[in-house]
Amino acid sequence: MAFAGVGQGLGTYDRTEQTSGASLGRVASRAHFTDTHPSDDLPAQTEEHRAREVGHLARQLTRQSVGGTDDSSALFSYQQGSDLDPFSDKFCARRWTKLMFEALQTSGPARKAGLSFRNLDVHGFGSDADYQKTVGNLPLVGIGALRDLISNRKRKVQILNSMDGVLEAGEMLVVLGPPGSGCTTMLKTIAGEMNGIYLDESSSLNYRGITPKQIYGQFRGEAIYTAEVDVHFPNLTVGQTLSFAAEARAPRNPPGGISKKEYAKHMRDVVMSVFGISHTLNTIVGNDFIRGVSGGERKRVTIAEASLAGAPLQCWDNSTRGLDSANAIEFCKNLRLNADYIGISSAVAIYQAPQAAYDCFDKVSVLYEGEQIFFGKTTDAKQFFVDMGFHCPSQQTVPDFLTSLTSASERTPREGFEGKVPTTPQEFAARWKQSDKYQELLAQIAEFENKYPVHGKNYQEFLQSRRAQQSKRLRAKSPYTLSYGGQVELCLRRGFDRLRADPSLTLTQLFGNFIMALIIGSVFYNLPATTSSFYSRGALLFFAILMSAFGSALEILILYAQRGIVEKHSRYAFYHPSAEAVASALTDIPYKVINCIIFSLTLYFMTNLRREPGPYFFFMLISFTLTMVMSMLFRSIASLSRSLAQALAPAALLILGLVMYTGFAVNVANMRGWARWMNWLDPIAYGFESLMINEFHDREYECSAFIPMGPGYEGATGQQHVCSTAGAIAGSSVVNGDDYINLSYEYYHAHKWRNFGILIGFFLFFTAIYMTATEFITAKKSKGEILVFPRGKIPRALLAQSTHSHGSSDDVEGGKFAGGSKMKKQITGADRADAGIIQRQTAIFSWKDVVYDIKIKKEPRRILDHVDGWVKPGTLTALMGVSGAGKTTLLDVLATRVTMGVVTGEMLVDGRQRDVSFQRKTGYVQQQDLHLETSTVREALRFSAVLRQSNTISIKEKYEYVEEVLKLLEMESYADAVVGVPGTGLNVEQRKRLTIGVELVAKPALLLFLDEPTSGLDSQTSWNILLLLRKLTEHGQAILCTIHQPSAMLFEQFDRLLFLARGGKTVYFGEVGKGSHILIDYFEKNGAPKCPEGENPAEWMLAAIGAAPGSHSDVDWHQAWINSPERVEVRRELARIKETQGGKGEAALQNKDHEKSKSEVKAEYAEFASPLWKQFNVVLTRVWQQHWRTPSYIWSKAALCALSALFIGFSFFKSGTSQQGLQNQLFSVFMMFTIFGQLTQQIMPNFTTQRSLYEVRERPSKTYSWKIFILSNIVAEIPWAILMGAVIYFTWYYPIGYYRNAIPTGAVHLRGALMFLYIEMFLIFNATFAIMIVAGIATAETAGNIANLLFSMCLIFCGVLAPPSSLPGFWMFMYRVSPFTYLVDGMLSTAVAETSVVCSDIELLTLNPPSGESCGDYMSTYISNYGGYLVNENATTACEFCSMSSTNSFLAQFNIYYSNKWRDFGLLWAYVVFNIIAAVGIYWLARVPKNTGKEQASEPEGVQEKLVPAQSSEKKRESVSRGSESTAA
């Protein structure tokens, strides 16, 4: 819907009535306009009638405008509660529309858009099927891609074939077809979204004189495409989200003399009123993880946002998904009104279109596997196919009939037409093109093109109208409305709104950095102004500069979180992506300034860095500048990549390179010539140099240790002793700071401000890259629906299709072959299975007076209110109700799946209480199709069968049963297909079938629950699913199924109905009856209006009880049920079931138990069907398979290990045993530890994927134990850790040359083997540590942040940056607790102990002995006490002394001793065991429900079953507390 002035001229609104109580302002009714105007409620009328009516309205409005009968100023200066107040119950949309039309007359005619298309051919490049990538075959993919690149070979895939059509301004087109037929591609092509799809040169499109190139560029935003997914900033309120859209497209000169901001606010209020979301003004939008508005309301926010874009041509792709049919009809009616009075053209794809919605449209296009089989008036379509020879059942709606034609199993030829009707898509298309209707269409297209020549009069008017709305500061061909500065300002305001809405990350980072500053400040507390602090000052500044630099690394994740939203807004022409980039960077500046001040103040003055104003402010300046530079660098990486994985992989290596070549770990003098360029390109290096110069320049430091010193040297004076520090001069008691950094680091004071200038240059360079990349590089193209198979298992039929280049695109639809009729014919060879294989059930499940109470925000709320019912074998029972009635909650309560709150009432199986085995004996098909994406269909079914069927059944029998279920569900054609993700894997229907299959193969002994099995499916697929359920019930399956607004044909498939009103109150429980007559009779006799002939009973019932939008009922239907004789009969039947079945069940049970051994009886009632050892074996195999089939995980792990090890190894290549060489070897171990964080973050997402599946589906169904889940995930990581350890060992140990240190000791092999074991322990510790941290935490991101904090602590206190001798006493416990202490101790002592030191020339200290003494005589006492050696023992002047002779002396400075090697190795095993035990313990504490699920034996009526809050995990607590709102849909 386009709204006046936002896009162009005139908008039409319905009134929203707000109600009290639970609905609180949800649209209860949209009152019809008071004027008599038939088009509001009747089906779409003829074009002639509508043209007359619009002309009449225009003349009437013009007369009113001239005569001034209705003051248009009242539009914006209305009184509260008047008929122009959008928040008022009296809001009159028609009057508002008339006034807005008058007000906008002054700005010229409204823009209108229509289009014609001839020979529309669209293709992509891809295939219909692909093979699954694994660790083993991934290299082959690279070779194949290289071959294709060299040969320029692309596989062209045709999506749309030769389509024709015309859509005049003010007309509405509905596009019908099953998923994969090309509906999405058609809409995207019309709207100009050509990302990954291509238009053939022969295709012709004409947008009323505007070319496709102009629509896609200059007029982007005038034709928009709205996808079915809802992408919004979750923490912004609905009001903020829609205000932004309204302001972004507000015209330059709003009517009524008001400001743009006031105008945008008014438009927002009106559009919210129209879509019934005024009550959500201050509610956050939310998403799948953040609670906000309900799913249906979020969908309406998406629709409202697109409406505010004001495009004259709008394409809506399944935008009614998630809305019930009543709201879907309202949406279509609103589009109809816009089309009639403004001239908006709409093209809408709807999967389950109610008849009333279909009647709103002028034209329909029917697609069948990429072929157009009809395009014309909606009133002509049905007759066209009936004349062709097809039968339309009387109870079938026209849209369902048209969609059914694309399914061979659903379409029915009329008598006498068998064999004469078309059967393939190509035959249908050929028949269409031979028809008279097609010739009429071609004539209409020709007329349209003659009327609107390219760049004719209409184009000029369109251009003028658009230009009048744009800012004067915009170039003529800009698609945007606001100037660039205006866009930045708008995005900046939104940025601060987002910050205020969710400051948690910012505050957490501020607090975390403050804590880190305190810790580091205390470690290096009050450094003395002596030479003993030189190393510590360097280490401190190194750590400080890294904290400033890498504080922005998380910005990669933040940018990817908002990328989809920014790209959507760019398509709507709200703003330049680069404007949002500028605003985003500016929004972060206040945080960065505050963080810099807090961090600098704390660290700088605690550690006694140079306490002078100039140096302090320079320290802050460099820290802040470097923070900004690195922020832009990370943002550039995110913007240059198309997926998060592409961004994170180079970022990890880049961070390592930047740290290595800062100048501390490897100083400039020791950098290899071939790697020196990395230092020149490293921004951190320039910052570090400036901070070192800032600290050391022009300062004299007292010498803390002279050589020689001690007994016998008390009288040494002048040049007879020298300070033991680089830069010292013999005889001087102080060391000049400049001399020290010149000699040790090659840093010079002249570089101080030069480096600042270089940092500014880096900032400008990265900012330019960031803004350019943001503007031009879009996210990864979405792949089409293609099936994926393990290598060697792709069916021949699909291989043949791929070869012939017909199928899907990279972009959207490939499901047309993946599940299409052609494939089914060619691949399916097996006969259909008989549903008789389903285990026939005999138990009756009944419930009585079920009540469920929970607390929300400490307020008690009743979700279910005394609900009664039963499910008998061989019956299909529907559970229906309004949104929020508690349908899903009732299923969860009955299936024992709620984990908090209080449940009361009776739930009996054959009159007896449910036992601990109840959950595994029932099947629960959830609404979300959750499966492990790396498994194949057959493997997913086998996994469920092996673990959930009785352990007494052999594996062979279980596998045979799986094959039967595959046939029954008609899944054998894709039994070997990989589940994958939507788009690359199974399509929606196939996933739903698999979800049902997983529960069926478990042989549920009691019943099957299904939650919304048809949600999001097209009508054809929904029908197939219902037929399948019907087939199951005919063979004894008991089924209870929630369903949302079924069509009349679907509704007839159910035997019984349980209908709930809001608050979980029963409205009806009983039989439906043939033609729904029992149900209809009940409601009619209790006061409902008569059900019209041919009406959908489900929709009639909702309207009759006042549950549909626009409906009202004076009857209290819950009370009517309570007082009804039908309820009395239900209660009588429940008592009978309990009495008769209870006795029978007990007797049958005892007989059955007598026939079985004790162990068999125990197994029958056990919590799990399989023993623990079997669970471990099966689950471990699946986890291992998941790793093997996720090559991105294993190869990125291997790449990180190999490349990091090689990078470190060759940066410290062949490090010698000079003092600097030893320091290099120390830092080579330290730098190897820095990959710990990245390795941890690679492990966590894989674990959370498995955990989500386990906790949502497998744990509630008692598939296997939580202990098995944790242990199998840990064990599966160990082999990969060992393999990666070997990779690191060979690429790191040998290049550095550690093995050469062992040659003098004769223990080369022993020490090499010991180093190998230590590296393995490092990686095993890493794997177990990662799982321990993530075990109890909801998201991998949060766990990653905690792991990084702990890792940083371990790194600081391991004894490298701050040797134990310099640590304050209260931090010594951290030194002893840190596992890295023992790793450093073991690895470094194994690497360099027991070897001689050979000083380099610059490390030699020069002094003169007393006259008459040789150097050897003078220094002998000192050497015997403290070690070291003389180069020239016999000299009498200029003694050259090296302060170390053995590497053991160097190691002793860091408290490292070779004798501890086996102690350290044993302690590391202790840490690993601790991690495993802690992982199990933390998971149990945080995420395992503590209620065991056992129930008391039958007690008198009213017994309470208390379900204590079972989990401390916030996520679980929230999901249960949502029972009343979102899950109770």
From Swiss-Prot:
<feature type="transmembrane region" description="Helical">
    <location>
        <begin position="505"/>
        <end position="525"/>
    </location>
</feature>
<dbReference type="Pfam" id="PF00005">
    <property type="entry name" value="ABC_tran"/>
</dbReference>
<feature type="glycosylation site" description="N-linked (GlcNAc...) asparagine">
    <location>
        <position position="235"/>
    </location>
</feature>
<keyword id="KW-0677">Repeat</keyword>
<dbReference type="InterPro" id="IPR034001">
    <property type="entry name" value="ABCG_PDR_1"/>
</dbReference>
<dbReference type="InterPro" id="IPR017871">
    <property type="entry name" value="ABC_transporter-like_CS"/>
</dbReference>
<keyword id="KW-0067">ATP-binding</keyword>
<keyword id="KW-0547">Nucleotide-binding</keyword>
<feature type="transmembrane region" description="Helical">
    <location>
        <begin position="539"/>
        <end position="559"/>
    </location>
</feature>
<feature type="domain" description="ABC transporter 1">
    <location>
        <begin position="144"/>
        <end position="394"/>
    </location>
</feature>
<keyword id="KW-0472">Membrane</keyword>
<dbReference type="InterPro" id="IPR003593">
    <property type="entry name" value="AAA+_ATPase"/>
</dbReference>
<dbReference type="InterPro" id="IPR013525">
    <property type="entry name" value="ABC2_TM"/>
</dbReference>
<protein>
    <recommendedName>
        <fullName>ABC multidrug transporter AFR2</fullName>
    </recommendedName>
</protein>
<feature type="transmembrane region" description="Helical">
    <location>
        <begin position="1193"/>
        <end position="1213"/>
    </location>
</feature>
<keyword id="KW-0813">Transport</keyword>
<keyword id="KW-1133">Transmembrane helix</keyword>
<feature type="transmembrane region" description="Helical">
    <location>
        <begin position="648"/>
        <end position="668"/>
    </location>
</feature>
<feature type="glycosylation site" description="N-linked (GlcNAc...) asparagine">
    <location>
        <position position="742"/>
    </location>
</feature>
<feature type="glycosylation site" description="N-linked (GlcNAc...) asparagine">
    <location>
        <position position="1434"/>
    </location>
</feature>
<comment type="function">
    <text>Pleiotropic ABC efflux transporter that confers resistance to structurally and functionally unrelated compounds including azoles such as fluconazole (FLC), itraconazole (ITC), posaconazole (POS), and voriconazole (VRC).</text>
</comment>
<feature type="transmembrane region" description="Helical">
    <location>
        <begin position="1353"/>
        <end position="1373"/>
    </location>
</feature>
<dbReference type="InterPro" id="IPR010929">
    <property type="entry name" value="PDR_CDR_ABC"/>
</dbReference>
<keyword id="KW-0325">Glycoprotein</keyword>
<feature type="compositionally biased region" description="Gly residues">
    <location>
        <begin position="1"/>
        <end position="10"/>
    </location>
</feature>
<keyword id="KW-1003">Cell membrane</keyword>
<feature type="glycosylation site" description="N-linked (GlcNAc...) asparagine">
    <location>
        <position position="318"/>
    </location>
</feature>
<dbReference type="InterPro" id="IPR003439">
    <property type="entry name" value="ABC_transporter-like_ATP-bd"/>
</dbReference>
<feature type="transmembrane region" description="Helical">
    <location>
        <begin position="589"/>
        <end position="609"/>
    </location>
</feature>
<dbReference type="GO" id="GO:0005524">
    <property type="term" value="F:ATP binding"/>
</dbReference>
<feature type="region of interest" description="Disordered">
    <location>
        <begin position="1"/>
        <end position="21"/>
    </location>
</feature>
<feature type="transmembrane region" description="Helical">
    <location>
        <begin position="1314"/>
        <end position="1334"/>
    </location>
</feature>
<dbReference type="GO" id="GO:0140359">
    <property type="term" value="F:ABC-type transporter activity"/>
</dbReference>
<dbReference type="InterPro" id="IPR027417">
    <property type="entry name" value="P-loop_NTPase"/>
</dbReference>
<feature type="region of interest" description="Disordered">
    <location>
        <begin position="1493"/>
        <end position="1529"/>
    </location>
</feature>
<feature type="transmembrane region" description="Helical">
    <location>
        <begin position="757"/>
        <end position="777"/>
    </location>
</feature>
<keyword id="KW-0812">Transmembrane</keyword>
<feature type="transmembrane region" description="Helical">
    <location>
        <begin position="1465"/>
        <end position="1485"/>
    </location>
</feature>
<dbReference type="InterPro" id="IPR029481">
    <property type="entry name" value="ABC_trans_N"/>
</dbReference>
<comment type="similarity">
    <text>Belongs to the ABC transporter superfamily. ABCG family. PDR (TC 3.A.1.205) subfamily.</text>
</comment>
<feature type="transmembrane region" description="Helical">
    <location>
        <begin position="1227"/>
        <end position="1247"/>
    </location>
</feature>
<feature type="transmembrane region" description="Helical">
    <location>
        <begin position="1268"/>
        <end position="1288"/>
    </location>
</feature>
